[in-house]
């Protein structure tokens, strides 16, 4: 599987026109079950809203879904989905809640409102790249701890909090395939005594 871009957690964007409020809530979702669960969560929290429009994109099966939820066809879910498509992001869902202000907006006004609210939620989101990574671990003497940690950080790895016992255990993540130069540096630092264990590759934001 290739690297891909998505968002971390959730984000919100709002737009108001003629007293109608459009609240776009965006969330990471890597399955249809998670996307639907987020939709139901937003619906439950906004039971008095006139509409809860949604759109989502999933890597799994290249699925894309949307709903206008009672708005005129192609004025709500379609423009929201198009914003997600143009972003290049996947594994995410957006639910746009509309609180009606009493004034009809027309086709153009609705498209603009749902597009803008979704775009603002994307602007507020933290975008991450999901890559194939490995988690590695090495135990060193206290005398080598700081130098080993500096080597790991200089390699661009994500270093977790060390564990201190009679020695120091360091654990970190880095993209799969980038670890050989660092492992060689650690062997040189420890004069060949470093025993590094590595996990199977897995996909995670990096």
PLM features: residue spans?
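Active-site beta-strand/loop microenvironment that shapes enzyme catalytic pockets
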Residues: 76-125
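Short glycine-/aliphatic-rich beta-strand segments at the starts of folded cytosolic domains
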Residues: 127-144, 172
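Flexible, glycine/charged-enriched surface loops at secondary-structure junctions
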Residues: 51-52, 125-132, 160, 195-197
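Conserved short beta-strand edge segments in small beta-sheet-based binding/regulatory domains
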Residues: 159-163, 190-206
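Short amphipathic alpha-helices in soluble, non-transmembrane regions
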Residues: 148-154, 181-190
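C-terminal regulatory domains involved in ligand/effector binding and gene-expression control
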Residues: 1-75, 197-206
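Terminal, non-globular segments
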Residues: 172-181
């Amino acid at each position: 599987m290739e690297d891909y871009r998505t968002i971390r957690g959730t984000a919100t964007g709002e737009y108001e026109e003629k007293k109608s409020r459009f609240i776009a809530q965006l969330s990471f979702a890597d399955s249809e079950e998670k996307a639907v669960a987020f939709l139901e969560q937003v619906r439950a929290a906004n039971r008095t809203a006139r509409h809860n429009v949604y759109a989502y994109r999933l890597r799994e099966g290249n699925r894309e879904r949307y709903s206008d939820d009672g708005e005129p066809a192609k004025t709500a879910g379609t423009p929201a989905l198009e914003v997600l498509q143009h972003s290049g992001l996947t594994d995410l869902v957006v639910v746009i809640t509309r609180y009606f202000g009493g004034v009809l907006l027309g086709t153009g006004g609705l498209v603009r409102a749902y597009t803008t609210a979704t775009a603002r939620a994307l602007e507020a989101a933290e975008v991450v790249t999901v890559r194939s990574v490995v988690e590695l671990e090495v135990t060193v003497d206290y005398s080598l701890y700081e130098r080993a940690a500096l080597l790991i950080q200089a390699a661009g790895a994500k270093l977790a909090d060390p564990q201190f016992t009679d020695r120091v255990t360091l654990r970190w993540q880095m993209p799969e395939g980038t670890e050989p130069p660092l492992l060689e540096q650690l062997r040189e630092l420890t004069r060949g005594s470093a025993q590094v264990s590595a996990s199977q590759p897995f996909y995670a934001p990096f």
